[in-house]
Structure formats: structure tokens, C-alpha cells
Amino acid sequence: MYSNKENVNILTALLVKEKITKAVVCPGSRNSPIVHNLCACPEIECYPVTDERSAGFVALGMTLADNEPVVVCVTSGSALLNLAPAAAEAFYQKRPLIIISADRPAQWIDQQDGQTLQQHRALEPNVRKSVTLPEPHNEEERWYCNRLVNEALNAVRLNDGSPVHINVPISEPLFEYDVPKLPDERNIFMLHATTDSICVYEMAADFFRGKKLMFVLGQLTPEVVGNSLEAIEALKKVAVVIQEKLADDDIGPAQPIDEVLKMIGEDEAYHPDHLIYIGGTIVSKRLRQFLRECKCKMSIVVNGIDEFCDTFMHTTDMIQGLPEDVIGIFANETEGVKKRDFVTLWDKAFDKALAIRKTIRPRFSQMLAVKAFHEKMREEAVDGELFYGNSSAVRLGNIFSDQYIYVNRGVNGIEGSLSTAVGYAIAHQEEEDVYCVIGDLSFFYDQNALWNESLPPNLSILLLNNGGGGIFHQLPGLERSPYRDSAIAAQHTTSAEGICQTHDIVYLSARNEEELDKSLDKLFNSEEGPVLLEVFTNAEEDTQALKDYYQAF
């Protein structure tokens, strides 16, 4: 029988799946559930050592014998600090040492309770990874606990071996052993990708044996996308490839991702069974939710070195490497792979959604302003780079842009969007025009980007001003708060006209569709620069325009 502590059982189950066979265990009551489980596992041999400092080096010596990871487990408090010398030695010798410490619950740290100190990250920087496990109370916390253990156990094998620290808070009662078997935990397998990586080629071959194949491309630089265009086209012949304009350097309509997801509802025919996620963040919350609901037999995430992202909560395999390398490897494995009915199903849905999109003419709103902006760019054959602000602005760009979008999506903050566009425009002022589409809060928050002696003439700004944070009008339930507009959405009556006068920026404005059309003509044909077009809209009308748009699908 095993302990009834769920985080302890998740940890134990994954140690077994990782084929850990040796554990040095030290005495204590708080770590007794862990020690009990280790001793109860027939796959793990336990070696009791009383002195923690010695125990750490005993475990280190075991790793030298066969170069396999070894556990050393201690109780809470200063017992953990006694492992610091062994952790440091293991770090510099590159030894795979798994340090497991029991801990008191977080609420009892620094409360003059017995055997307590700040244990999280206590051994850094001399361990490769430090994690503190939650005590799970729901499925999301169970997933989080599983992910953290996987993260640590994968890190222990990095770079020929490294020590890691897994800290395990355990609440009382401690001594209940009534669980008959360990849970069947998800074990995430990690590979390192190079262009001659045989294991990654084998994984790609396994992937293409699936029936419902999907690639999701998160934010990628235009250089990476450009270098991978042929490979991406090869993938599209056999798999569904989802890419927002943050990962699409092709000139053409934006993929109607949210629109299709609205159309298909809960139809599982559209769910992939083999999924690979490459690149950075995706904008669409609807897409993230959709993919989290999919039950994939194989779910691969491509991460950078020392990254461990499990965005869709069902990762089975991870590849650490460059996106273009992995895209190229998988594209090379498409030879002889037949196009699946799954691809045809999605292609028809995309075509239908694009046809509907063409028929929609929004009311005067931010949506119309962005649509008209991109239509005018096409009419005038404008060649330039696009920068978008976050929140509502980039979501509209992902509907109407037909070219690559730059956006600060790493953290998704509203600060710095304008400054980033200014920086790019300065660096490229002799080569190309730069257009920044931005919401009012993001613009006014970052207006000092224009207080700049180097402000270049090749910068044009489309400012969407609806008197506050428009996205807060789109969040269901927030309308019930009487403080939404004044305190949450930062309602205001500010205009950019005075700012433009101060910084010698050509100022244009529009308050209706006719003014918008005329001002866009001036924006794209102005011989002076920089130039700013401020479009004034109503937040409620903006919200309704968005609702009307999605109701059409």
C-alpha cells in the first residue's frame, strides 16, 4: 500500500516510469510518506543513511557507478541545507542527482513552527532545476504537479547530467497508507533536435502514422517563417497547419481560425489525434481552449533549450531545438504520406469561413477601421511592415491582415508596443515604411515613444480610440460591475491631437465612415511624416460589431 498524499504518489509513479532504481533515504517524519513510497516500490532499492550531508555524497557516488540518476530524500528544515555541498559537487561534475525534500505547507513557513525555512530554490544556483509541488485539490492542480515533476526529471538528464531539487509540501496527517497502487501518470519524453537527429526523424515518422494530423505554429520571426516556407507548404499537403499572422509571412487572407472554431462547435471530427506545437504564443484564446479539449494520442511541443511548455495540458513528447530545424525534419518525412480526409475537412471549413468573411461589412467601429485600413493597403499596393498593439487591436489584425504582423506577444503587455514600432522604424527608415495599429490605452501609456529626436518620417500610426480598454467590454460578466468603465477599463476622453502637435506629427482624425475613407487616403499618400490617424469609436458599438461578426458563422 502507498501513502494517500497525491503529490507524493504522482512523484513516485514518475520516478518509476523514468526507471529510477536507487534512492538514498534519510530519517524524518515529514518525509516519511515519500520514504514509505520509495521503499514500497519493488522497482526502487532504498539505502538508509542517517547523516544528510553524507547521504548526498553517497548518492553522488552511486551516480558515478553507472551514470544513472539517483534519488536522495530528506525531511524538512535544515536537513535540506545539509545537501548543499553534494548538490554543488554534482552540479560541477554534471552528475544526475535527484534531491527530494519534504516541506511544511506554505502557510506555516516563517511562523515559528518546527523544522521550517524557505526551502523553494534553497539550493540554487547549484541545481539545474528547482520545483515545489502543489498539494492537488483539482484536475488542473494535478496536471500542474505532473508537469513540474516531468520538468525536473527531464532536467536531470540535460547536458550529460545535472542535479535537480524537488520540494514536496506535505500536510498532516502524515501516516496514512491506504492507496493500493500508484497512478498511471503521463510521462513526457524529451528529445534534442538537430538536423541529423535520428530520434527526431523516427518521432516524425511515428507522427505521420496518425489519421488526424495538425501543426500549430505560434509566433515566429519572419526570417524563420521565410526560411521554412517550402517545408510548411509540404506539411500542408498532408496535415492541417494552423498559423495566425504572427507566424505567416505569406501574402494572403488571414486564416479564419476563430471563425471555424465557432462554426464547428463541439464536433470531434475536427479534433486532431496527432498534434505538434511549434513557436511562441498564439493570440486566439478559443484555439487554446479547443486544443486543450482534444484527446491526442501524440502531442508534441517544440521548445527552446531549458524551456518546458505544456500549453495544451496533454504533451506526450517534447523536442528541444530550433523551430526551422524541426519543421524541416518533419517536412522531409512527408514523402509518401497521403493527404488525410482530415485535411480536406478543415480546408472546406476554412473556405466556407473565408467566403462568409468577404460578405461582412461591419458597422462603424474599430473592426471597420482595421478592415478598411487593410483594404486600402491592398488598393494602394502599400509595401510596409505592420506592428500591432495587444488586446483588441491584434485580434482584429488576425482577422483582416494579409501580411505578417509584429506584436509584443511574449508577455502580452500593453506597454511598449509603440516604442517597439518606433525602434524598428528608426532601424529601417531608409528601406521601408512602418505602420503601427494600436489601441488608445496602449498608445497613451507609451506616448513617450514619440518624445524622441530620432522619430523617423517612415512611421504611420492608426490609433483606435474608443475612450477606454475596449476588450473589457467583451468579457462576459464584467458588465455586472458598476466600476467596469471608470476603474477597470480606464474610461477617458483623451485625444492624441495635442501630442501630435507637440512632436510635429501630421494629425488626422475620423468619427464616421466617410471621414475614415478620406483620412486613410491621406495616411497612405502623405508626403510628410510621421503621420497619425485617430479613429474615434464607441466602445459599445465596437463590442456589438464583434458580436455581429461572429454570429455570422
Give each language-model segment a name.
Residues I100, Q107-Q118, I399-F553:
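Thiamine diphosphate
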